[in-house]
Amino acid sequence: MALDTSTKAQIVSDFQRAQGDTGSPEVQVALLTARINGLTGHFKANAKDHHSRRGLLKMVSQRRKLLDYLKGRNVDSYRALIERLGLRK
């Protein structure tokens, strides 16, 4: 599901490194996580929506790639991000 403008702006302001930062891996992962969480609710009501499921899998893959990139560049930032988003147990 697409995020509305106010939700997206809130996520960007929470995870940006500096003012106006929208492209850092932290922001991109947070936005993808919000979209993924929105789609998981959609699949509870629409279990046979395979077209959207493919999009979900692409988003999960993109998030995984960004997290791998961030882990290679800055492990402390990676750990802080997954803690804030609640991605790992």
Curated annotation (Swiss-Prot):
Bilayer-crossing regions: none
Gene3D superfamilies in the cross-refs: 6.10.250.3130, S15/NS1, RNA-binding
Gene Ontology terms, MF aspect: rRNA binding; structural constituent of ribosome
Keyword Transmembrane: no
GO terms of biological process kind: translation
Keyword Ribosomal protein applies: yes
Pfam families from the UniProt entry: Ribosomal_S15
Cellular component terms (Gene Ontology): cytosolic small ribosomal subunit
Taxonomic superkingdom: Bacteria
PANTHER family to which the protein is assigned, alphabetical: RIBOSOMAL PROTEIN S15, BACTERIAL AND ORGANELLAR, SMALL RIBOSOMAL SUBUNIT PROTEIN US15M
Subunit field text: Part of the 30S ribosomal subunit. Forms a bridge to the 50S subunit in the 70S ribosome, contacting the 23S rRNA.
HAMAP family: Ribosomal_uS15_B
Protein's job: One of the primary rRNA binding proteins, it binds directly to 16S rRNA where it helps nucleate assembly of the platform of the 30S subunit by binding and bridging several RNA helices of the 16S rRNA. Forms an intersubunit bridge (bridge B4) with the 23S rRNA of the 50S subunit in the ribosome.
NCBIfam families associated with the record: S15_bact
Family: Belongs to the universal ribosomal protein uS15 family.
Name of the protein: Small ribosomal subunit protein uS15
Species the sequence originates in: Azoarcus sp. (strain BH72)
